[in-house]
Each structure stands twice: as C-alpha cells, then as structure tokens.
Amino acid sequence: MQEIIASVDHIKFDLEIAVEQQLGAQPLPFPGMDKSGAAVCEFFLKAACGKGGMCPFRHISGEKTVVCKHWLRGLCKKGDQCEFLHEYDMTKMPECYFYSKFGPLCRHRHTRRVICVNYLVGFCPEGPSCKFMHPRFELPMGTTEQPPLPQQTQPPTKRAPQVIGVMQSQNSSAGNRGPRPLEQVTCYKCGEKGHYANRCTKGHLAFLSGQ
C-alpha cells in the first residue's frame, strides 16, 4: 500500500549516505584491537581504505572462506592478519577432520540427537534403524586381554654368589650386635668412662672443671 501511495525507491536518506561513507567513525586508539563485533569496512573491499590498522571496521579479504576455529573460542590473536574468517557463518564452518576421515562413524557429535533410553537400559528393539542415538562407549579391557607389562616379561635376575655371601654376613653381624660394655662407654658430660650420660650424677658442665 505504501508503494502505491508514495514510493521511496528514488529517495536516499542521509543515514544511508553516512553508513556507506562511514561518516563519524573514529580511528582506534591503538592498532591490534579486537574488532570481532564491528562491521565490515566498505572502503577496504574497494581497496580505498587509508586508515590501515587504525580502522575501526573489519578488513575481510575475499579468499577467507573458512571460519577461524580459534576465533570461535576467543583465542585468535591475529586480528585482520588472520587467514581465516572472523565471522559466525554456519555455511563456512571448518570441517571436522574426523568426520571427513570416518564419515558418519565419527564419534564426535555433529547433530544434536537424543540418546535412546532402551539402548542405555541394555536392548533397543529398533536396532540400527532407531531414530534416537546409540552411543558407543569405550569399555576398559579386562586383565586377561591386556598385554603383559614389560617388567613382567623380564626373567628374574640372578645375583652373584659373592654378593649374596657379603649381604648375609652383614645381616648376621648386624643381628649379633649387642650393647657395648660399660668399660668402653665414655660420658660426654663429665668425660669419665664406666657410665652413660643419662646415668651421670654430675652436671653437664663438669667436663670444664675437670671434676
């Protein structure tokens, strides 16, 4: 109805001119800032942008056909110098390497599906034609299926008879060792022989006076 009453196709508003010419756009305070949420620079597409790295708009090249996977996680630091697209576009998402290699058998989720309750219980009558997802769980291997560890396969090493004899003699000498006789005990408090320090009746400074 509005086209019949008054057509505005031939009218160009000041707002449209300001947007096309990017009027009022202030340069960045310093280069290298994150411009992920900014619009695309129209002058850069025409190779006419003279602001360079100070331009507040994104400089996107035409060959960027794949979305940057690091930008999706907020980890890309290249900015406009990145060779991938910094724009959320489902048609240009990077292809999963595992999906390209294994196809539908890829274990990574590509479509949102509901897990089959019957399959989780233990049996699904629909089988492979079930419309719900049948996840594949990696079960741990049993002890009989696991390969033997390297230290278990090595034969036990035999010690030399000389070493065994030395160890036995050391153990026997350590086991037969008893308390020292009092004649060989010297008290560190008084310096006399014949008793231990805990049995000494003199003071701990008696060795200084020679008493």
From Swiss-Prot:
GO MF annotations, alphabetized: RNA binding; zinc ion binding
InterPro entries: CPSF4/Yth1 (IPR045348), Znf_CCCH (IPR000571), Znf_CCCH_sf (IPR036855), Znf_CCHC (IPR001878), Znf_CCHC_sf (IPR036875)
Matches recorded under PANTHER family: CLEAVAGE AND POLYADENYLATION SPECIFICITY FACTOR SUBUNIT 4, CLEAVAGE AND POLYADENYLATION SPECIFICITY FACTOR SUBUNIT 4-RELATED
Family: Belongs to the CPSF4/YTH1 family.
Compartment annotation: Nucleus
Phosphoserine: residues bearing it: S209
Protein source organism: Mus musculus
Gene encoding the protein: Cpsf4
Protein name: Cleavage and polyadenylation specificity factor subunit 4
Origin organism lineage: Eukaryota, Metazoa, Chordata, Craniata, Vertebrata
Gene Ontology CC annotation, any one: mRNA cleavage and polyadenylation specificity factor complex
Tagged with keyword Zinc: yes
Residue intervals of every CCHC-type zinc finger in the record: 185-202
PROSITE patterns membership: ZF_C3H1, ZF_CCHC
